[in-house]
Amino acid sequence: NYSAKRKADSPFIGKTAYTWRMSEFKVSADNPNQADRSSERILLEFDWVNRKHNGGGLAFGPDGFLYVGVGDGGGVHGVPDIYVPPKTDTNDPNRHAEEIPEDPFSIPEQFHKYDLYAQDTKKLNGKILRIDVDHGHPGYAIPPTNIFRGKSEGRDEIYAWGFRNPFRLSFDRAGNGDFFVSGVAESFWETVYLIDRQGNYGWSIREGTHCYVRSRAFNPPKKCATHGSLGEKILSPIIEYPNWSVMRKESTVKAKPLGTANVGGFVYRGKALPSLYGKFVFGDFSSEIIRAIVCGYPHKHMAGTMERQ
């Protein structure tokens, strides 16, 4: 992703196993469509749980700061490769495929702790970070209004927390500059968040507006915490919709599925489709439908749908 200053920032998993790294590259002098590999400036790196849920959403906000989506690490959704079940022949190259359950609803209990990372404000997992990449070289500076800046309760970089895998971020470049984060469900509920304030957006206490407990994912409780560990109110998405997991025979959630995985979107500001102007337009991985919602908080309804053309 290129900023107005022709920089490229891209998070990726480094060559060392389970390291999360975000680097800045300059544009190649020979090809404006390529990055100069030799120009790498490592902005941030830290140990990682697994090869999944890396996040990856990046966007420069109207304030000029870089917003970074960091996933929870996927330590539960797809058991970490470091796990070898008891009584397993460690010389068997197929041991993982044979003995580790692939179903995210059937994960060994010792790995449930990874669900808590997104709520832990001492960790960067499951967060939206906000950093100033134009200062603080060779790393970055912390914006003065970040919620935990200079406080012991959390990491300075954190802007918002409680996300499973915020892999798509976008700002409305007109209007109020609204900030949208799209999330993919762990169990049933796909979400879109309007980040209109710093705070706690729920995972893994909630999935969307619904209570979440991994040990009873098919039969989630009706009541759960409404506030986080710091006393903060848990904030809700502006939209959620059920995915195909609600159709599984074990599910007690009664809803009509509308897709498989929310892939994110943008506020439309073009001229070709006037009826969509100012609406947040987004897609789903499998439904073949593009949806649009009226921007604004706290609208939860889908304002309209369009079949794929």
PLM region spans:
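A well-ordered secondary-structure block
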Residues: 42-45
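Short glycine-/Asp-/Thr-/Trp-enriched loop segments that recur within the blades
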Residues: 47-55, 159-161
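Metzincin-family zinc-dependent endopeptidase catalytic domain
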Residues: 2, 24, 52-64
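Extracytoplasmic
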Residues: 17-22, 38, 53-55
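Beta-propeller domain segments
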Residues: 2-23, 27-33, 67, 71-308
